[in-house]
């Protein structure tokens, strides 16, 4: 049997094995201008070298080990001969003053040495020279460093380098063999519920055909295990290599961890990491990743490979506590260690942004020119529409430009000039803007921002680790975001200006349809599974999350008995803006009171906004309060501890508890209150988003596309919030409960068509009949039990 061959680029090899020093986020990034200047400088230097100089020479060399072959490949910037001797030329463009460089950077020299070894092997040379050429990107001043090596010296050095890499590859292949054996007899860990087998077979078929699938399956079906299990089996069958379980909220990451743990209890060998937000993994009070402010950043790169290798080879599950434990032991940054470890594991559980966000995505997996046999499982996929729009949109505020200019005076005249240029360009747009103004493109602002980025990168490199004011650094990231999104502009974008709160213009690059950008990311892998309890209507989500025409779709009905819950629509009440006032608030408060009086227990009432909630709560407490009913309410900006305390009330309550909450908020999805913890959800209104510039732009955009713009901008997003809120009730086969939809609009055809199939038994009620109807339902439940 042929040995497997692992291919790795020269650059990736040396940057991985030979990295050293500190973590420091104070330097600039490789922006477009620097890359363009670097390419021009390369070509200029190569063009000057004459006919004896060969530019961009492809080289590769395969080393055979007992278990695997490792092929190292890349392109040398130049190979030339001088006085009969071969020389490898490695060119690096920098903003720094090259005259101050005392020696080449170690990884740069190592790259050249790899090329020298391969070239010497090919040409059968006894010795070869290495030339490091450093060029300033602005002045084009050059500095050269030269060294000569014998074939023997290079051979010993190269073999040592490769042996250090081989230990990683050897363990990886041994682990995969063990992993795949563990999957051969792996069975679904539970008795299949209704609908689960349909999801499992649909997901497996999707992965095997390298397609995408949308799975609409209500709460209680067991979507998490029904998607993870077939994905794991597909990896075992060689249909994929890594699973990415993507979520929008922390709670769903925990559910995914539990699913993998259950499969491991049934014999699965699988390495699973959860990527936690940097702020939650940081040992410091403030995430300042530089050696001056963080002990863990100091010398991080000297130790991180040993830390990752030990953690990878001794553990199979990597949650926050495990990562912190090992980071402390090795004195490294836990977040960066986590990202490095992710490359070597079988499954990554993480937030959407680590795959989709152009500023945050995992470059180790999804960088330019990289791809893999990835299986994407996208949980709560309905959230990806708004998250996608957010990730793929950007803006520049003239107020921020002026503030940055003020701060830049002490640092760089070039930056001040570039910022003033952008300020003038934005001021021109400001004169033409009243409420908002749609533009064909960002115009000259794009070029101006590119120049600002170049000046800021230059400044960051020249500072040599000295800190910029935090506000100026934040503006730097804003500029980077703007330029990243500027590159993506197409027919899925609307460029517009609007006036900011401070009276200065804001130029926005608004992604109205994120499907094409999401598709570009998913193309880096093999297949994708979008699943949620609320992917209705499915065509809407397909349009906004995928550009493919061959996606599969599955609709799974609820496995729960309809007789265990009662759904009623209140037809004599409205949440319309035009109807809001004491009379309507009193009617809604009366509905709430009559509902909770019919049976002791815990209820949640969901409102379209905090203001609406507070107005109704005030009326309720003034006119309908009772000793046996306790009310609690959600507040804006609750932290994790406050959220947990709120939810604990539902476990501890013995009387009747009414939680006043906001639709689309932290309590309307992703929480499990089973059994008696929650027996009713009262939903006030249709969840329509507030009218605003972005929503109106969406409506107009989709109207022009020939579809109902109101549906796409308002009705569908609103109905999703309603369905999510309703999904808090009935979480298991044994649960009983009621769902009350309070708004006359729910009785209309436009909304009835959006109800899930299992709501077919929905009834209507009025304020006069609701107590009797709910009373009959609870009586029937008591008699049955």
List the predicted regions and their residue ranges.
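Metal-dependent nuclease catalytic cores that hydrolyze phosphodiester bonds in DNA/RNA
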Residues: 1-84
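Mg2+/Mn2+-dependent nuclease catalytic core
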Residues: 61-155
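Conserved pre-motif I regulatory segment
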Residues: 174-216
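A substrate-engagement module of RecA-like helicase motors
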Residues: 186-187, 239-348, 356, 424-439, ...
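Walker A/P-loop
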Residues: 208-230
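Signature of the SF2 helicase/ATPase Hel1-core->accessory helical subdomain module
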Residues: 227, 254, 328-347, 351-456, ...
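A contiguous, basic/glycine-rich beta-loop/short-helix subdomain that forms a polymer-engagement track
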Residues: 323-348, 359-366, 458-574, 579, ...
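Conserved RecA-like P-loop NTPase helicase motor core
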Residues: 571-583, 635-746
């Amino acid at each position: 049997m042929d040995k497997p061959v692992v291919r790795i680029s020269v650059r990736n090899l040396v940057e991985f094995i030979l990295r050293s020093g500190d973590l420091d986020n104070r330097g600039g990034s490789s922006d477009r201008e620097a890359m363009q200047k670097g390419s021009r400088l390369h070509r200029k230097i190569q063009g000057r070298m004459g006919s004896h100089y060969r530019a961009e020479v492809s080289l590769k060399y395969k080393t055979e080990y007992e278990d695997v072959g490792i092929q190292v490949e890349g392109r040398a910037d130049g190979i030339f001969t001088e006085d009969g001797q071969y020389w490898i030329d490695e060119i690096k463009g920098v903003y720094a003053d090259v005259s101050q460089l005392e020696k080449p950077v170690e990884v740069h020299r190592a790259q050249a040495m790899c090329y020298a070894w391969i070239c010497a092997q090919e040409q059968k040379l006894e010795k070869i020279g290495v030339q490091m050429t450093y060029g300033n990107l602005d002045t084009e001043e050059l500095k050269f460093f030269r060294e000569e090596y014998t074939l023997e010296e290079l051979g010993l050095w190269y073999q040592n380098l490769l042996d250090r890499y081989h230990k990683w590859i050897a363990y990886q292949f041994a682990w995969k063999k063990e992993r795949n054996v563990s999957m051969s007899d792996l069975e679904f860990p539970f008795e299949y519920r209704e609908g689960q087998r349909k999801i499992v077979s649909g997901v497996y078929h999707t992965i095997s055909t390298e397609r995408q699938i949308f799975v609409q399956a209500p709460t209680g079906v067991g979507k998490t295990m029904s998607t993870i299990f077939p994905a794991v089996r597909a990896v075992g069958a060689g249909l994929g290599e890594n699973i990415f379980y993507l979520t929008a909220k922390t709670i769903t990451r925990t559910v995914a961890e539990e699913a993998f743990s259950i499969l491991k209890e049934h014999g699965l060998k699988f390495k699973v990491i959860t990527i936690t937000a940097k702020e939650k993994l940081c040992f410091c009070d403030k995430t300042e990743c530089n050696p001056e402010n963080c002990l863990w950043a100091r010398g991080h790169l000297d130790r991180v490979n040993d830390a990752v290798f030990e953690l990878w080879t001794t553990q199979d599950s990597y949650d926050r506590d495990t990562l912190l434990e090992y980071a402390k032991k090795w004195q490294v940054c836990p977040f960066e260690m986590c990202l490095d470890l992710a490359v070597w594991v079988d499954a990554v559980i993480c937030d959407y942004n680590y795959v989709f966000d152009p500023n945050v995505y995992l470059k180790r997996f999804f960088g330019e020119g990289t791809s893999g046999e990835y299986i994407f499982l996208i949980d709560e996929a309905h959230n990806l529409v708004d998250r996608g729009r957010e990730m793929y949109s950007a803006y520049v505020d003239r107020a921020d430009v002026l503030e940055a200019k003020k701060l830049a005076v002490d640092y760089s005249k070039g930056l001040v000039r570039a910022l003033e240029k952008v300020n003038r360009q934005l001021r021109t747009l400001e004169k033409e803007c009243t409420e908002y103004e749609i533009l064909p493109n960002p115009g000259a602002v794009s070029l101006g921002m590119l120049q600002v980025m170049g000046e800021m990168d230059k400044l960051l490199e020249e500072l040599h680790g000295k800190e910029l004011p935090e506000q100026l650094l934040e503006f730097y990231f804003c500029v980077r975001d703007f330029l990243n999104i500027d590159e993506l502009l197409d027919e899925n974008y609307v460029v517009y200006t609007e006036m900011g709160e401070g009276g200065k213009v804001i130029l926005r690059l608004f992604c109205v349809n994120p499907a094409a950008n999401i598709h570009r990311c998913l193309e880096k892998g093999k297949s994708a599974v979008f699943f949620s309890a609320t992917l209705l209507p499915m065509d809407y989500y397909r349009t906004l999350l995928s550009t493919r025409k061959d996606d599969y779709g599955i609709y799974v009905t609820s496995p729960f008995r309809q007789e265990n819950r009662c759904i009623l629509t209140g037809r004599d009440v409205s949440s319309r803006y035009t109807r809001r006032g004491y009379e309507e608030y009193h009617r809604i408060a009366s509905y709430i009171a009559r509902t909770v009086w019919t049976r002791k227990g815990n209820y949640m009432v969901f409102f379209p906004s905090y203001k609406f909630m507070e107005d109704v709560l005030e009326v309720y407490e003034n006119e309908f309060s009772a000793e046996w009913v306790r009310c609690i309410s959600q507040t804006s900006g609750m932290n994790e501890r406050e959220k947990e305390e709120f939810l604990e009330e539902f476990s501890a309550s013995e009387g009747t508890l009414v939680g006043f909450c906001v639709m689309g908020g932290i309590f309307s999805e992703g929480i499990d209150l089973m059994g008696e913890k929650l027996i009713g959800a009262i939903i006030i209104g249709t969840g329509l988003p507030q009218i605003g510039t972005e929503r109106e732009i969406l409506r107009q955009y989709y109207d022009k596309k020939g579809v109902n713009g109101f549906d796409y901008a308002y009705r569908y997003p609103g109905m999703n919030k309603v369905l999510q809120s309703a999904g808090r009730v009935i979480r298991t086969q044994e649960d009983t409960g009621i769902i009350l939809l309070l708004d006359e609009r729910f009785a209309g055809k436009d909304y009835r068509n959006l109800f899930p199939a299992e709501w077919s038994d929905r009834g209507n009620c009025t304020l006069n009949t609701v107590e009797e109807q709910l009373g009959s339902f609870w009586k029937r439940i008591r008699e049955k039990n």
